[in-house]
Curated annotation (Swiss-Prot):
One of its GO terms (cellular component) is cytosol. Keywords: Cell junction, Cytoplasm, GTPase activation, Membrane, Phosphoprotein, SH3-binding, Tight junction. It is found in: Membrane; Cytoplasm; Cell junction, Tight junction. A motif (SH3-binding) lies at residues 753-766. The lineage of its organism: Eukaryota, Metazoa, Chordata, Craniata, Vertebrata. GO terms for biological process: negative regulation of small GTPase mediated signal transduction; regulation of actin cytoskeleton organization; regulation of Rac protein signal transduction; signal transduction. Residues 653-664, 679-698 have a biased composition (Low complexity). It is a peripheral membrane protein. The BAR domain mediates the interaction with the coiled coil domain of AMOT, leading to its recruitment to tight junctions. The modification Phosphoserine is found at S484, S575, S702, S704, S762. Component of a complex whose core is composed of ARHGAP17, AMOT, PALS1, PATJ and PARD3/PAR3. Interacts with NHERF1, FNBP1, TRIP10, CAPZA (CAPZA1, CAPZA2 or CAPZA3), CAPZB, CD2AP and SH3KBP1/CIN85. This is Rho GTPase-activating protein 17. Rho GTPase-activating protein involved in the maintenance of tight junction by regulating the activity of CDC42, thereby playing a central role in apical polarity of epithelial cells. Specifically acts as a GTPase activator for the CDC42 GTPase by converting it to an inactive GDP-bound state. The complex formed with AMOT acts by regulating the uptake of polarity proteins at tight junctions, possibly by deciding whether tight junction transmembrane proteins are recycled back to the plasma membrane or sent elsewhere.
């Protein structure tokens, strides 16, 4: 207690008073002392932060630490998930990645154990052991110095007071002297020990810095091992990724998609084309009418994942067409490539048609192989779609307008308006002729089901769908679909099949019963007399349900040539003629029909041909007359008793319609008129009635109106792209058609030219390449004797007209026709199907044809069923009157 009291007293004197304070450390040792505090603080914080970096539990062995790592938990989760997705790409990826994460966790645990042992623990020893020991010695030295100063101060005080009281102080002074010497020795010992420890610490500073070098080396080694694990795992995962073909197709370069999937045609293109071939070829406004956004998004997602379950999209062809447009537009590079953009635009401005086709052919050959194959596939489909433009209204021009901007665009696009203004015109000028001449650009046949992955489903037996002869989907089966014409057509066939009467709904898509009557001419004019020695060529009568199908097969391949006539409206009518379905008569086979027309001879047929009678419309039949507008829709009345002999002028025995099989022209230009060759048989006297005219009779007669006839036409036949030459049968005689052959040879010529120097086809008739355009103007003024009649119709007899009372409606002005010398009185009278014959002494003639055979009179007694069927039709059409 006395020593402690002396220390406090001495410390107070040194702090407050003026007592001398002894400093035993040198300047170097004082500097080392100040650094110790800084080093201790640094080591303490470094240790604390390193421990925080550990992901495992601090202070445990490597195995236990590995189990506690977050990476280990992640690896276990991935491996467990991979067992639930064994056969999928995701399952394989999870399994491989889980193994890699487990290896990384093992490397990490070993790394942390090493860092903890080699770095963290030594830093902890520096901060918490070595430096504190030195600091303790420094404090001990400070206490010894205080003791030494206190003893020395007391000794000095005793030595001063010894002069006044010398006898009693010698013993006390000696004691203080000894105590002071002892304290000084202790100070020196402590000072030496402290200095040694400080110098040792400074000597070890290089070793302490090596800890951090070891830390970085340990981290580098850990990362190298981890990188080795990753480099070993990544190729395996990439292999799984490359082997898995189900990757998005939209927005992927065409070459990459084809290489990855191993396909020749891009999946979205082939899938959409196959779907449209099944259900979309008769959809009006295909590629032009937008689809629902949700439906389109769903279809694109289904195509992206390469799913084969696309049955639900059969009912919405507009969504399929929208997906095809979207795929073409989302390609990083257009199908017609950026590199050829300048060449395409330059070719578009060429005025000469032949040179333009040659340049287009050369540019097509420059396309990359993958682009060329897919472009050819798409163009072939679009050409097939354009063949049914009479139904879907998608002519080559319309298709080019809608799809062109999705096939070619500039590399650096501006705004949408600028792109549309700069590109659309050029693209349309390029795409339209390629579609029109698709068979010349790509003469080889294209199998649309390239991958053989699309199998058409069987049609239910209740869906009696039917096709016209040249329909684009005649080789596929119709599917039931809402808002589609296929179901409506099938229903109409079922409803009217009992009367052996088919209605071609394609001629007027939105026409009901009233419209169907309005689009047909009200009256059928009698025909000029013909020789009675000829027979109507006909075949066996088909069953009611298959009448359209047989007529399709019979007239589907009739070649359309330059001699085909396309009748326009008469001067007095404001509406174009509308085609109407045939009755039970089927169009004969093309070989027989064409050979008879081309040869100009009459081919006798069997007596069963008398059952092939049907009512037809004149070749230049005009639109509906005012009388038809007064008709009302009524149910068919039962057939009344028939009179024994109908009027001689009744044209009930006419054969199939001679109307052009082309649909009404959609072009703003009026169709041209082409005169027919004069008839070959005009020797029958006017007073002799035609034998076939006795086979049918109207239900009632009027004193001023002629019996109403319901004209019937064969189904409209869209022209084919590649027209074969017309071949005559061996028994047919006469030269081939002089007008059709040049046109056809002009189309066949390019197929024999060398590929590098193509010769463009002589410009074919517009009606051949585009059904919506009128016939070429050059045929309008051609020689009437060489003009070819319609190649897809049956010749029909000409009954003798019967004088009728004069009605109140005057006939319209008629263009002059070509007649024989014996019919010079009829040159100013034009045929009409919607006007009433006004002169009781005159006969209304029809545009003359090369062959107008007439049936034998003995066949009249064999066609009672045909008369009944035709009477039912007449009764239906004349109910309002």
């Amino acid at each position: 207690m006395k020593k402690q009291f002396n220390r406090m007293k001495q410390l107070a004197n040194q702090t407050v008073g003026r007592a001398e304070k002894t400093e035993v450390l040198s300047e170097d040792l004082l500097q080392i002392e100040r650094r110790l505090d800084t080093v201790r603080s640094i080591c303490h914080h470094s240790h604390k932060r390193l421990v925080a970096c550990f992901q495992g539990q601090h202070g445990t062995d490597a195995e236990r630490r590995h189990k506690k790592l977050p990476l280990t938990a992640l690896a276990q989760n991935m491996q467990e998930a991979s067992t639930q997705l064994e056969d999928s790409l995701l399952g394989k990826m999870l399994e491989t990645c889980g193994d890699a994460e487990n290896q990384l966790a093992l490397e990490l645990s070993q790394h942390e154990v090493f860092v903890e042992k080699e770095i963290v623990d030594p830093l902890y020893g520096i901060a918490e052991v070595e430096i504190p020991n030195i600091q303790k010695q420094r404090k001990q030295l400070a206490r010894l110095v205080l003791d030494w100063d206190s003893v020395r101060a007391r000794w000095n005080q005793a030595h001063k007071s010894s002069g006044t009281n010398f006898q009693g102080l010698p013993s006390k002074i000696d004691t203080l002297k000894e105590e002071m010497d002892e304290a000084g020795n202790k100070v020196e010992q402590c000072k030496d020990q402290l200095a040694a420890d400080m110098y040792n610490f400074m000597a070890k500073e290089g070793e302490y810095g090596k800890f951090f070098v070891t830390l970085l080396e340990a981290q580098a080694d850990y990362h190298r091992k981890a990188l080795a694990v990753l480099e070993k795992t990544l190729p395996e995962m990439r292999a799984h990724q490359d082997k898995w073909a189900e990757k998005p197709a939209f927005g992927t370069p065409l070459e990459e998609h084809l290489k990855r999937s191993g396909r020749e045609i891009a999946l979205p293109i082939e899938a959409c084309v196959m779907l449209l071939l099944e259900t979309g070829m008769k959809e009006e406004g295909l590629f032009r009418i937008g689809a629902g956004a949700s439906k389109l998004k769903k279809l694109k997602a289904a195509l992206d994942c390469s799913t084969s379950h696309l049955d639900e999209f059969y009912s919405d062809p507009h969504a399929v067409a929208g997906a095809l447009k979207s795929y073409l537009r989302e390609l990083p590079e257009p199908l017609m490539t950026f590199n050829l953009y300048e060449e395409w635009t330059q070719v578009a401005s060429v005025q000469d048609q032949d040179k333009k086709l040659q340049d287009l052919w050369r540019t097509c050959q420059k396309l990359p192989p993958q682009n060329f194959v897919n472009f050819r596939y798409l163009i072939k489909f679009l050409a097939k779609l354009a063949q049914t433009s009479d139904v879907n209204k998608m002519t080559p021009s319309n298709i080019a307008i809608v799809l062109g901007p999705n096939l070619l665009w500039a590399r650096n696009e501006g705004t949408l308006a600028e792109m549309a203004a700069a590109t659309s015109v050029h693209v349309v000028a390029v795409i339209e002729p390629i579609i029109q001449h698709a068979d010349w650009f790509f003469p080889e046949e294209v199998e649309f089901n390239v991958s053989e992955a699309f199998v058409p489903l069987t049609t239910p037996s209740s869906n009696h769908s039917f096709h016209t002869g040249n329909d684009s989907d005649s080789g596929t089966l119709e599917r039931k679909r809402p808002a589609s014409m296929a179901v409506m057509e099938g229903d109409l066939v079922k409803k009217e099949s009992f009367g052996v009467k088919l209605m071609d709904f394609q001629a007027h898509r939105r026409g009901g019963t009233l419209n169907r009557k309005h689009i047909s001419p009200a009256f059928q004019p009698p025909l000029p007399p013909t020789d009675g020695s000829t027979v109507v060529p006909a075949g066996p009568e088909p069953p009611p349900q298959s009448s359209r199908a047989e007529s399709s097969s019979g007239g589907g391949t009739v070649p359309s040539s330059a001699g085909i006539l396309e009748q326009g409206p008469s001067p007095g009518d404001g509406s174009p003629p509308k085609p109407k379905d045939p009755v039970s008569a089927a169009v004969p086979a093309p070989g027989r029909n064409n050979s008879q027309i081309a040869s100009g001879q009459n081919q006798p047929q069997a007596a069963a041909g008398s059952h092939q009678l049907s009512m037809g419309q004149p070749h230049n039949a005009a639109g509906p007359s005012p009388h038809t507008l007064r008709r009302a829709v009524k149910k068919p009345a039962p057939a009344p008793p028939k009179p024994g002999n109908p009027p001689p002028g009744h044209p009930g025995g006419q054969s199939s319609s001679g109307t052009s099989q082309h649909p009404p022209s959609l072009s703003p230009k009026p169709p041209t008129r082409s005169p027919s060759p004069p008839t070959q048989h005009t020797g029958q006297p006017p007073g002799q009635p035609s034998a076939p005219s006795q086979l049918s009779a109207p239900r009632r007669y009027s004193s001023s109106l002629s019996p109403i006839q319901a004209p019937n036409h064969p189904p409209p036949q869209p022209p084919t792209q590649a027209t074969p030459l017309m071949h005559t049968k061996p028994n047919s005689q006469g030269p081939p058609n002089p007008m059709a052959l040049p046109s056809e040879h002009g189309l066949e010529q390019p197929s024999h030219t060398p590929p590098q120097t193509p010769t463009p086809p002589s410009t074919p008739p517009l009606g051949k390449q585009n059904p919506s355009l009128p016939a070429p103007q050059t045929l309008a003024g051609g020689n009437p004797e060489t003009a070819q009649p319609h190649a897809g119709t049956l010749p029909r007899p000409r009954p003798v007209p019967k004088p009728r009372n004069r009605p109140s409606v005057p006939p319209p002005p008629q263009p002059p026709g070509v007649h024989s010398a014996g019919d010079s009185s009829l040159t100013n009278t034009a045929p009409t199907a919607s006007k009433i014959v006004t002169d009781s002494n005159s006969r209304v003639s029809e545009p003359h044809r090369s062959i107008f055979p007439e049936m034998h009179s003995d066949s009249a007694s064999k066609d009672v069923p045909g008369r009944i069927l035709l009477d039912i039709d007449n009764d239906t059409e004349s109910t309002a009157l």
